[in-house]
Amino acid sequence: MNSYFANPSLSCHLSGGQEVLPNMPLNSTTYDSVRHFSSYGTTVTQNRIYASPFYSPQDNVVFGSSRGPYEYGSNVFLQDKDVLPSCRQTSMGLNAQSHVAQEYNLEQARAGTQDQKANNIQIYPWMQRMNSHSGVGYGSDRRRGRQIYSRYQTLELEKEFHFNRYLTRRRRIEIANALCLTERQIKIWFQNRRMKWKKETNLTSTVPGTESAGTPQETEKETEEEPKKKD
């Protein structure tokens, strides 16, 4: 078994008696730089290369011209280089996924805080929209429906109208706060109620006039008939 290290890329195999470096003479000056490293690797004495006693031959190391089971060629380094970009891609993908997950968590937290704020807002009765068909939709082109008042609201408004047909703004604000209505709603209600009251008064005033107009004609006819009977 040869004791020198063999290069797997070389096509020729050197025998024990051939020189390792044929282009250079085997003299002491050539191997001066190698002799002071006698404790490591191979040593050169008497124009021969043999293994150092510090290293014992093993199966996983290549000695001589034969190749062991764990041989490392030039392709190994290329394969390692090819693995690096894939590792970088996977690391970049993991970083992107973690960044997306963090953004999603932040958005969920913001949405939760906004929902909590919306739920904590106190809604007063005057803030609710009461004069629409379904109570939903605030578009300008949406036709407003008729306001529906409760029995309690109508009763209180009728009482107020019985004493005062015209309200001051201060009194209107007080009634609006008491009945959970707006000033505009109370103003419109009083306007409609005054119109209704005027119609009622006009009807009551016209009915007695028609009756009084008919009675004189009947009396005249009766007076004319009485003298004829006497004759």
Swiss-Prot record:
Sequence motif Antp-type hexapeptide, residues: 123-128
Predominant place of localization: nucleus
Annotated GO MF terms: DNA-binding transcription factor activity, RNA polymerase II-specific; RNA polymerase II cis-regulatory region sequence-specific DNA binding
Gene Ontology cellular component annotations, sorted alphabetically: nucleus
DNA-binding region coordinates: 142-201
Sorted UniProt keywords: Developmental protein, DNA-binding, Homeobox, Nucleus, Transcription, Transcription regulation
Polar residues composition bias: residue spans: 202-217
Pfam families: Homeodomain
Subcellular localization, as worded in the UniProt entry: Nucleus
Region Disordered, annotated ranges: 200-231
Gene3D superfamilies for this protein: Homeodomain-like
Organism domain of life: Eukaryota
Membrane-spanning residues: none
Family per similarity comment: Belongs to the Antp homeobox family.
Function of the molecule: Sequence-specific transcription factor which is part of a developmental regulatory system that provides cells with specific positional identities on the anterior-posterior axis.
Name this protein carries in UniProt: Homeobox protein Hox-C6a
Gene name tied to this protein: hoxc6a
